[in-house]
Every structure is written in structure tokens, then in C-alpha cells.
Amino acid sequence: MDIRNEPFIDYLEDTEIIINCVPGFMGFETSKKILEKKTCVDISFMPEDCNELNTIAKEAETALYPDAGVAPGLSNIIVGNLITKQEIDEIKIMVGGLPIEKKPPWNYKAPFSPIDVIEEYTRPARIKKNGIIETVKPLTGLI
């Protein structure tokens, strides 16, 4: 299914919440389409200002949970839900891109969109410093 050109939301009528897992460059428009009919949890980063989607969500009586992430993020939400429904002694959440069997040249397995993995290290970052949100060059203060 090509979500850019097909009315994918029609296939999801029986759902209450949709988890948007598309690459970041598609996230804003996909969340916009979802919010017209459903509540959306977006696990990816989107370069656009997701606050611009508030009007759509309010008019449709839906909600957006942006930039929720995978782990920490969606995995923790799922575990939290499980804990409310049953007794659990131990949970292991294992998410990552470091494979047991490494394959050159990268020795890495992208757990999500390779474009987004690269962008995590190349796009400007937002940080909170002394209570003020700043946009800085990638890896500022780390290397």
C-alpha cells in the first residue's frame, strides 16, 4: 500500500488508535491524515512543528502523541498497559541496531528507517539548557 497515494485510513476503520511508524520525512503528512479520523501515536521524529496539527485533532476530536519513540517510548507504554492487566514478575525490553552476527561494512542493523538513523546524527538537535530550549549542531557537547 502506498500511503502517500491511497486512502489507507479507510482500511483502519475498526481501530481506535493508529501508531505511525513511517520514516520521519513522511511523518507529518501521515499523522495529518490519521488525525482526521483517528488518534495517532507517532514514534518517529518529524522535522515539522507537530503543534500545527492541533487544530485538525481538536476539530476531529482525536489526539496526537508525537515523537513517542520506540524504547524508551512505545515499548514502555505497552509494558505499562500489560502491568495494569496482569501480574508480571520481569520484563526485558530489547531494541537496538547492534546485531549478534555483524555483517560488514556497517556491522549495524537499522531497527527502523536507515534515513532516520543517519539523520539522528546529522540534523540539528533541540536541547533544554537552563530551562531554555535551544537548537544546536548535531552531537554538540558529546564529541
Q: What are the functions of these language-model segments?
A:
Residues 2-14, 26:
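Conserved Rossmann-fold cofactor-binding substructure of NAD(P)-dependent oxidoreductases
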Residues 3, 24, 44-50, 69-71:
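Short, acidic/turn-prone active-site loops that include or flank metal/cofactor-
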Residues 10, 29-32, 55:
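Alpha-helical segments flanking ligand/cofactor-binding loops in enzyme cores
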Residues 12-18, 35-40:
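Short acidic/histidine-rich motifs immediately flanking catalytic phosphotransfer sites
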Residues 17-33, 47-49:
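Beta-loop-alpha module in the N-terminal Rossmann-like domain of NAD(P)-dependent dehydrogenases
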Residues 43-66:
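Rossmann-fold NAD(P)-binding glycine/threonine-rich loop
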Residues 73-91:
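Oxidoreductase and adenylate-handling cofactor-binding alpha/beta cores
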Residues 86-143:
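Active-site-lining helix/loop region of Rossmann-like oxidoreductase modules
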